[in-house]
Amino acid sequence: MPRQFPLNKTRNIGIMAHIDAGKTTTTERILFYTGRVHKIGEVHDGAATMDWMVQEQERGITITSAATTCQWRGHRINIIDTPGHVDFTVEVERSLRVLDGAVAVFCSVGGVEPQSETVWRQADKYGVPRIAYINKMDRIGADFFRGVSMIRERLGANPVPIQIPIGAEDQFKGIVDLITMKAIIYVDDLGKTSDVTEIPEDLADIAAEYREKLLEAVAESDEELMMKYLEGEELTEEEIRNGIRKSTLAVKMIPVLCGSSFKNKGVQPLLDAVVEFLPAPVDIPAVKGVNPDSGEEDVREVSDEEPFSTLAFKIMADPYVGKLAFFRVYSGKLSSGSYVYNSTKGKKERIGRILQMHANHREEIAEVYTGDIAAAVGLKDTTTGDTLCDEKHPIILESMQFPEPVIHVAIEPKTKADQDKMAIALQRLSEEDPTFRMSTDHETGQTIISGMGELHLEIIVDRMMREFKVEANVGRPQVAYKETIRSKAKAEGKFVRQSGGRGQYGHAVIEIEPLEPGAGYEFVNKIVGGVIPREYIPAIDNGIREAAETGVLAGYPTVDFRVTLVFGSYHDVDSSEMAFKIAGSMAFKEGAAKANPVILEPVMKVEVTVPEEYMGDVIGDINSRRGRIEGMESRGSTQVVRGYVPLSEMFGYATDLRSRTQGRGQYVMMYSHNEEVPRNIAEGIIAKRKG
C-alpha cells in the first residue's frame, strides 16, 4: 500500500497543558471536526474517546497519552494527548521526544499554572515549536490578554496573538482573525456554522493594535519583509502566513489563538493553525544517533529511502493483544511481519501486526512510513526508549532520561493466590512506566513500590486490582530518602578466610569522594601493574553498588559519589569474584562512614492558591512545615504563594489546607530537588530505622 499522505502533509503534534485547562475536550473536538468521532464525548460525563482507561473516566483526568490519527484539509495529523497532572510528567517527557510540534492549551481564567511551566520547560528542552490556545473563553473571569502576558512573563516566551476574542464569559461569540482582518461569529451550538463578517466597531482599535504587533513580529523573521514593513508597504496574507510559520518553526514566536472547546468555538481555526504553522517531519533536523558497532555519531535523514529507524516511546499492556509498543518512525519504512533489530538491547525482534490507533479502537495496517506514529504487537523485549532499526544499518537514537521516584509504599498481597499474580502485575506495570519501580525491603522482605507521587501510586494499585485482579493491602506512603557523602576518604576492604578447604581472599583499597547532585555513581579503576587481576575489577564495582543500595547511616541508597580503586592484592589460589565483591562492599562501608555521610530528602516546589483572608494562616503553616516562601502574587481575588517544602512535611496537606481555608484553597506540588536533612531530624530518621 503506497503512502497516503506525503511527508510534508504529516503533522505529529502533542496537546499539552495544566490539569483541567481543557486539553482532552479540545482533542475530542478536533476528532469530531475531522470526522473521526460522530458524537462528541464529554470529559465530565466520563465518555471522552481519548480517556479510555476506567480510572481516567472516573477521575476525569488523562493518565496515559493515547495516540490517535485524524485528517484535516488534506493533511494527516497524529495527535498525542498528554496528561497534565504532575505525577505523570514522564508521559509528557516521552511524548515530547517523538513529536514535531505542540499545542499548549491554557485556561483563560487560571492562565499559566505550575504544571504549564513544567511542561513548557520540557518542550524547551527538546526545542519543540508550539502554538498556544487560550481555552475556556466562556468561563467567568476569562481574560485573553492576561493569559498572553502571563505566557510572556512566566514562561519567558514570545507570544503573538493571531486572533483576539469577540466578547468574553457568556458573551463570547467568536474571534477576530488578525491575518485576514475578518470576524468569525459562531451561529450554532456545534460550532460547525460560522459567519465571516467585518470586525465589530468596538473592537476595531484593539484589532488594529494587535495586527500591528503581529506584522512587526512577522517582519523580524525575514530581512525582505522587514524592509517592506519599514517602508510602510502592505504585507500580503501569504507573506504573513509564511513569516508566522518561519518564526514558529525557529521557536522565536508562539502564535496565540483563543476559543471555547466545550462550546465548540475556535477549534477549526486551531486545526488550520496546526496545519499552517507547525512543522512537518521534513522541517525538523535529521535525527542523530550512535552506531553501536563503531560508537560514532550517525545520522538518519527524514526519508522513506533511508534505512529503517524508530523509537519506542510507550509500552502498554492491552487486554486483547498483549503488549503494545507505540513507536515513531524517523526514517525508512516497515511492513508487518518483518524482523527488526533492537539496537538498545542487541536483540532481533519480529513485528507481528502494526496498528494505527484511534483513541480506543484500532485499525490494522500493512506498512508504516517515515514520520508515522503507530503501535506494534509482538515485541517481547522492547521497553520504553529503545531504538528499533534495520539490522544491516544499526543505530541507537538518543534515549530519554527519567526522574527518580520520590515516594514509596509497602504493598502485600491479601492471599497466597494473589502473591504470584501481584509479582507479574507489578512487573508488567513497571515495563510500561519507567518512573514506577518495585523492589524488596532487605530487612522486612516486603515488596516496596515507588513512584512520582501519591496519585501515581494510587492509580498503579487501582490498575493492579482492575486489570490483573490482584487484591492487596497498601501501607502508608513513605518518603524515598537518599544518603550521600560530603567529604573525601580512603578506605580498604580485606576479606580473608583460610580455615580448611578452599580459602577466600580479596583486598581492595579505594578513595571515595562526593559528586554534584544528580551525578549518580562513578567507578574509576586506577589499578596498575596487575596488583588486582583485571577479571576481579567488575566484582569490586558490583560489591560497591550493592553496598550503596543500603547506606551506612539509615540504610537508604547512597547517591552522587565517585569511587576510585587505587590499590589491593590477591592470592593465586584463594582469590575469587565473590571474595573481591565482599572486599568492595567492606571498603565502601568503611569509606562512606568516614566521608561525613548525610541523609537527603526530596524537596517539593509547592504553589498554594487561597483567598486573601487565609493568606497569613497558610504562610505560617508552610513555615511550620520547614518550608521556604519564594514569592507571592495576586490573581484576581485570590493570592498565590510559591515556595519549597520537604515532601515528608506534605503528607495529608490536602485535608489540612481544606480545613484551614474552608475548602477554598488549592495547591499543586512537584518534585524539585534533594536537600540535606537537618541534623535533629536526621537523628530521628536514623533512630526510627534502627528501631
Swiss-Prot record:
CDD domains: EF-G, EFG_III, EFG_mtEFG1_IV, EFG_mtEFG_C, EFG_mtEFG_II. It holds the Pfam family GTP_EFTU. One of its GO terms (cellular component) is cytoplasm. Residues 8-282 form the tr-type G domain. InterPro entries: EFG_II, EFG_III, EFG_III/V, EFG_IV, EFG_V, EFG_V-like, EFTu-like_2, G_TR_CS. It is found in: Cytoplasm. Keywords: Cytoplasm, Elongation factor, GTP-binding, Nucleotide-binding, Protein biosynthesis. GO terms for biological process: ribosome disassembly. NCBIfam families: EF-G, PRK12740.1-3, PRK12740.1-5, small_GTP. Belongs to the TRAFAC class translation factor GTPase superfamily. Classic translation factor GTPase family. EF-G/EF-2 subfamily. Catalyzes the GTP-dependent ribosomal translocation step during translation elongation. During this step, the ribosome changes from the pre-translocational (PRE) to the post-translocational (POST) state as the newly formed A-site-bound peptidyl-tRNA and P-site-bound deacylated tRNA move to the P and E sites, respectively. Catalyzes the coordinated movement of the two tRNA molecules, the mRNA and conformational changes in the ribosome. This is Elongation factor G. It comes from Heliobacterium modesticaldum (strain ATCC 51547 / Ice1).
